[in-house]
Design a protein with these regions (language model features):
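Amphipathic N-proximal alpha-helical interface segments
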Residues: 41-68, 110-139
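A short acidic/small-residue loop/turn micro-motif
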Residues: 70-72, 140-143
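Long, charged/polar, surface-exposed segments that mediate recognition or autoinhibition
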Residues: 62-95
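Bacterial Sec-dependent N-terminal signal peptides
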Residues: 2-27
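Short, structured motif recognition centered on aromatic/hydrophobic residues
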Residues: 23, 44, 83
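A cross-family detector of function-defining hotspots
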Residues: 32-50, 92-114
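Glycine- and aromatic-enriched low-complexity segments, predominantly in secreted/extracellular proteins
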Residues: 11, 141-151
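A broad structural signal for alpha-helix termini and local helix breaks/kinks
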Residues: 27-28, 87
Length: 151
């Protein structure tokens, strides 16, 4: 849950009955369910099949999206091929997620490690199911090297 935690977040949200009912219908085997309020949405953080997930709902109880933690081999072939053509097969991967949205689209998110200008960095890639790169952001981890001058 590191990608969204702490931003506009309120713990211990009491989701309306309509929201809870929809959630239980969609994910009857979910465990460790915790409700929070994030950015104005009701969010259920839960475990499904041993993996972390989040389901997002509007104030009126309408399901908006669900984020699922997945494994590399669960990515569609087109997404794996696109990633490997751009970053190779040896790029260390930190996180992979599938995002199902209420407009019937699915987005695949890959967070991987790379080096930019000699600095360790994270690349955040979002792909459509057909392997089209939708968004690419880079977080360069610049370090403070003042300690190099300590005696």
């Amino acid at each position: 849950f590191a990608t969204l935690s702490g931003v506009g977040c309120s713990d211990d949200y009491n989701a309306p009955a309509v929201t809870r009912s929809d959630f239980e219908m969609r994910y009857p085997t979910a465990t460790h369910v915790e409700w929070e309020k994030k950015k104005g949405y009701g969010v259920a953080e839960f475990i499904l099949d041993g993996r972390e997930c989040e389901a997002w709902y509007t104030k009126s109880g309408e399901w908006v999206m669900t984020r699922f933690e997945i494994r590399y081999n669960e990515l569609p072939d087109a997404v794996r091929v696109a990633f490997e053509q751009s970053y190779g097969t040896q790029t260390p991967i930190d996180d992979i997620e599938r995002l199902e949205r209420n407009d019937n689209t699915t987005i695949y998110y890959i967070q991987a490690e790379t080096v930019v200008d000699g600095f360790p960095s994270e690349i955040n890639l979002e792909y459509s199911s057909d392997g089209t790169l939708l968004r690419n952001t880079v977080d360069v981890e610049y370090f403070d090297y003042w300690d190099d001058y300590l005696l």
